[in-house]
């Protein structure tokens, strides 16, 4: 797969039932573009996740006073690595994504499709998605998103617009009844899944 320069996500479930989900980022455009000469570590540009007065971010989000820079404060983040468990505490699904502000909508929609609508993990990840980030007040939709749903959204006052490349990559693992693990990696940006006995 091609190398990307921003966020990465990994979901892991062990045969013993332990789960780890990690979303990590150096932010946009290969971090700060700087590498430590002594360690070789690439430096991030997470300061860009704070709001700056009168400057919209790369995703079209306007500045918010709640996200202005303050000493000791962390910037707002869209990452949402998630582990779902059943009533007994057993892992049912491990999921997360990359893709800036689209992470939250992609993870929540994919999770809903699996947990509420009974889709398998591949169907849930591969199906077309919607995205709404509150501001600007519009719903972006992927090519082939069901027109019937879009028309219903328009009928209740939503503005819709087609999204170009959707840019969010979801990785998920679902435990099936009987304990079998199934996994899928989003076709939208390339990658792979693997399993070991």
From Swiss-Prot:
Location of the protein in the cell: Secreted
GO biological process: glutathione catabolic process
Tissue expression per record: Expressed by the venom gland.
GO cellular component: extracellular region; plasma membrane
Disulphide connectivity of cysteines: none
Chain segments annotated as transmembrane: none
Signal peptide per UniProt: 1-6
Major site of localization recorded for this protein: secreted
GO molecular function per UniProt: glutathione hydrolase activity; potassium channel regulator activity; toxin activity
Keyword Transit peptide: no
InterPro entries: GGT_peptidase (IPR000101), GGT_ssub (IPR043137), Ntn_hydrolases_N (IPR029055)
Keywords for the protein's UniProt record, in alphabetical order: Hemostasis impairing toxin, Ion channel impairing toxin, Platelet aggregation activating toxin, Potassium channel impairing toxin, Secreted, Signal, Toxin, Voltage-gated potassium channel impairing toxin
Similarity remark: Belongs to the scoloptoxin-11 family.
Function: May act as a voltage-gated potassium channel inhibitor. Is highly similar to the subunit beta of SSD14 which, when complexed with subunit alpha, induces platelet aggregation and hemolysis.
PANTHER family (UniProt xref): GAMMA GLUTAMYL TRANSPEPTIDASE, RE13973P
Protein name: Scoloptoxin SSD20
